Amino acid sequence: MNDAPTPNSFRAGPDEDGRFGIYGGRFVAETLMPLILDLQAEWDKAKSDPEFQAELKYLGTHYTGRPSPLYFAERLTAELGGAKIYFKREELNHTGSHKINNCLGQILLAKRMGKTRIIAETGAGQHGVASATVAARFGLPCVVYMGATDVARQAPNVFRMKLLGAEVKPVTAGHGTLKDAMNEALRDWVTNVDDTYYLIGTAAGPHPYPEMVRDFQAVIGEEAKAQMLEAEGRLPDMIIAAVGGGSNAIGIFHPFLDDKNVRIVGVEAGGKGLSGEEHCASITAGSPGVLHGNRTYLLQDGDGQIKEGHSISAGLDYPGIGPEHSWLNDIGRVEYVPIMDHEALDAFQMLTRLEGIIPALEPSHALAEVIKRAPKMGKDEIILMNLSGRGDKDVHTVSKFLGMDV
């Protein structure tokens, strides 16, 4: 996976307790701690096992379709009139997003641990689809927890999961979004620790999940680095990616963290604006607390109760963020900014019409930030954006906001 980080590297974390500075850790029920420690031990062995790495690489090539292309967005670049814009085309992967990278790695771990049942949480449905896909590939039953709100707005992905043989359990608690789905998945896991593997989709949760998910997703940045050197003979000036829990972003950011001349920007969901509570900008407008087994930036009230938040994008509709992102924000290595729903919708339409690529609403947030920054940069500068998912799943949501019937 990653080349070994050097001393004083931004890539050296987490420590042995799973912490990135004050963030991360393992805040779990006593019944789960033995399982978490078993997972840690199995992960430590798998990282250095050539057979595990070879099987993962084989599946990446022949099942996922890696490497994903690096694409120069010529018409978008000309339209914006500034920096050259490149996309890392993760939406071309099998299942339509970056999520499959992590799911393949974790299902191989589940097999090593002798687990016979897979559970997962999902927001946009992309992780649910990827989890159901790998479960089908390896012949394991799969239960996907999905907030009832997301079930309604992501109907195509719900049907795909069912086609793949997964049981989709709508969660009506709270606002029926990703946070609530994750709560239910954790309850299931506590009840079924012996036979069940919890396949977490984002770079959050108790250690070792944030590290594991990052390392399985780092293939994005590793490939992009080599591809950029081949295409331009140098690294990009800026990398931009959308951040919900943060798996696609940490996947492209991590291999570049020690390249000091590469500016890195994470884009949070600004929803309907930061003045109220209808957003999911955990770093921009949140504060540190504990949720889903790790300490990180959260949207919470004065009593530490988690706020619900909002985003037009189901995949960014989460009131927290991966702990490594929290740390990268605090040390100033990565800049985190919000993009509003309407800006993401405008970016969605612009890319579709200029490049013939229909992006998911998640990377549309990153694209909106690209649209802001590229014109202010020189024509000799380069922006690399992670195009983390395709927009088929979002067509109904977008059509509703545009006042069109589909």
Curated annotation (Swiss-Prot):
InterPro entries: Trp_synth_b_CS (IPR006653), Trp_synth_beta (IPR006654), Trp_synth_beta/beta-like (IPR023026), TrpB-like_PALP (IPR001926), TrpB-like_PALP_sf (IPR036052). Pathway: Amino-acid biosynthesis; L-tryptophan biosynthesis; L-tryptophan from chorismate: step 5/5. The keyword Transcription does not apply. Its cofactor is pyridoxal 5'-phosphate. GO terms for molecular function: tryptophan synthase activity. Pfam families: PALP. GO terms for cellular component: cytoplasm. It is an enzyme of class 4 (lyase). Keywords: Amino-acid biosynthesis, Aromatic amino acid biosynthesis, Lyase, Pyridoxal phosphate, Tryptophan biosynthesis. The modification N6-(pyridoxal phosphate)lysine is found at K99. Its EC number is 4.2.1.20. It comes from the Bacteria. Transmembrane segments: none annotated. PROSITE patterns: TRP_SYNTHASE_BETA. It catalyses: (1S,2R)-1-C-(indol-3-yl)glycerol 3-phosphate + L-serine = D-glyceraldehyde 3-phosphate + L-tryptophan + H2O. NCBIfam families: trpB. The beta subunit is responsible for the synthesis of L-tryptophan from indole and L-serine. Belongs to the TrpB family. Tetramer of two alpha and two beta chains. This is Tryptophan synthase beta chain. It comes from Agrobacterium fabrum (strain C58 / ATCC 33970) (Agrobacterium tumefaciens (strain C58)). The gene is trpB.
